[in-house]
Amino acid sequence: MGFYDQSVKDAKGNEISMRNFEGKVVLVVNTATGCGFTPQYKELEQMYEDYHDKGFEIVDVPCNQFKGQAPGTDEEIHQFCQLHYNTQFPQMKKADVNGENAIGLYKYLKSQKGFEGFGKGKMALAMAALLLTIDRNYKKNPEIKWNFTKFLVDRQGNVVARFEPTADMAEIAKAVENLL
């Protein structure tokens, strides 16, 4: 099974096949409305506006698994994103990305690209310190570590990159551009 064999539910509960995005460059991101990384919505929306007409899509999967930072209903989350960031990209139903109840899309993505570290800088060090308090062995498993982890999928459905929430958004935009 590949990327295009996966599906998720949209905020209204309709099944959305990843096959709908066949031939496009896709960024799948687990999000939250009450996270220190929530302002990344602004940069995600800018990427969407810049590249959507060239075949770029974002699949936004709200998730409440990290310190309960997406506590609202699907409608409340959607309204928050519209009001604060004017997001236009597709937003899915809130879902688990880790554990027994993780949706199939995330099981697949994690099987393709595991955790490779938080990178450099103060935020990366802070995330590493936080994760050590949660799971001393966090570096050894492919699980999603926090909100705003991103997976980049090329036009053929290959998962080509995983970006942790600490990744530079300009670096992500450049990776998207290179695939368009």
Positions of predicted regions on the chain:
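Hydrophobic beta-strand anchors of alpha/beta hydrolase catalytic cores
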Residues: 25-27, 150
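N-terminal "domain-start" segment that seeds a small globular fold
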Residues: 1-19
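Non-catalytic, surface beta->alpha helical segment in thiol-disulfide oxidoreductase systems
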Residues: 160-180
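Conserved helix-turn-beta segment immediately C-terminal to the redox Cys motif
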Residues: 24-25, 33-62, 81-85
